[in-house]
Amino acid sequence: MAVQKIIITPILVFLVTIFFNVSSSSSSNNSQYQFLNHGVRSAYWPAGDDFSPSLIDTNYFTHILLAFIQPEPISFKLEITKSGIKWGQNFIKALRHRSPPVKTLLSIGGGGSNSTLFSEIASTKQNREIFINSTIEVARKYRFDGVDLDWEFPETQQDMFNLGLLYEEWYNALFAEAKVRRKPRLLLTSAVYYNSTVRLIGKHGPRSYPTQAINKYLDWASPMCFDYHGTWDNNTDFNAALYDSKSEISTNFGLHSWIKSGVRPEKLVMGLALYGRAWELKDPNVNGVGAEAVGPATDTDGSMNYNEILKFNKQSGANVVYDKVAISFYSYAGTTWIGYDDGPSITTKVRFAKSLGLKGYFFWALGKDKDWSISKQASNAWGH
């Protein structure tokens, strides 16, 4: 998931203190976890996004994750600066009196963050303790309900082993802190690779997640079931196919790999993408899945949010195809080809997740579905 730096300032203390005085009933042990009884319907809000958090319709979500804050490279404590105060205040104000209420988590890391830094943090007990204590301090100070780690990605099997130690010590610290302060324990979650084994090209080869630690210490893990294909490929393909008979790169394979690895289904929250990937076709007359492409069709990396895709399809009169085998959409017009998800594919994926006994799903990211049509269909499919 794309990294954006979160900034927290002391000025927010007053705002969030008011919030939790007004909402003191949410501090009970029962209310902290009542959201988990009927599943998790969550989404990330990218820090500094031009989509105001005041526009978030909480009817469709149980948890909102604020993304992202980074650890400092020397102290290993969470980085807190004086900039970014405006969006920070807006986030707190927007969610403090919402009905229905949502739980908020502070997410650490993100795509493009420093994987080597996380490796160093996780490598020793002292480093882990400094980092963990900082996360608890910040989360409590600004009244979050939990913390989320998005380490993309551990690069060695030793990293994975150390990640398991980090989960264990983090959970134990959260449990002890909650007991001392007589408060509900902060939630602990982690965004992970779509597969239980990371097979990204690298000198260290495949490495598997610490599944026992995930079962024992996380409230849930969130496989990122997207970014399977993109403009780094020379041929068009789906961003987040549910099924792929030609390879292991699919949500079906990934989620089953997690379950086969020993992670209990109720510990998994499936990732969904509110964006697609756009290619420039080499030949506009060759426009199916697997067509040759010459690069991204946009000025960025080919990423287009759901609203932009709908606008493109309408304005260009694009041909829209629902692949009922892959359970994903693509559209094409001229030399532009886009792979993405729409209502029917999202609905099928959510029902698939529920059939596996998963805890829920999450979206990356809020602001890309401004009319809430996809969010609503996902929530309905979950049975809320």
From Swiss-Prot:
Any Gene Ontology CC annotation: extracellular region
Domain (GH18): residue spans on this chain: 39-384
GO molecular function (one): endochitinase activity
Positions of disulphide bridges: none
GO biological process, one term: chitin catabolic process
Active site (record annotation): 152 (proton donor)
Pathway membership, UniProt: Glycan degradation; chitin degradation
Record: glycosylation sites: 29, 114, 133, 195, 234
Domain of life: Eukaryota
The protein's Enzyme Commission number: 3.2.1.14
SMART domains cross-referenced by the UniProt entry: Glyco_18
UniProt keyword annotations, A-Z: Carbohydrate metabolism, Chitin degradation, Glycoprotein, Glycosidase, Hydrolase, Plant defense, Polysaccharide degradation, Signal
Catalytic reaction list: Random endo-hydrolysis of N-acetyl-beta-D-glucosaminide (1->4)-beta-linkages in chitin and chitodextrins
Signal peptide per UniProt: 1-27
Biological role: Possesses chitinase activity in vitro toward glycol chitin, carboxymethyl-chitin, colloidal chitin, and the chitin oligosaccharides (N-acetylglucosamine) (GlcNAc)6 and (GlcNAc)5. Hydrolyzes (GlcNAc)6 into (GlcNAc)4 and (GlcNAc)2, or two (GlcNAc)3 molecules. Has the capacity to inhibit hyphal growth of the fungus Trichoderma viride in an agar-plate bioassay.
Family affiliation: Belongs to the glycosyl hydrolase 18 family. Chitinase class V subfamily.
Listed name of the protein: Class V chitinase CHIT5a
Organism for this UniProt entry: Medicago truncatula (Barrel medic)
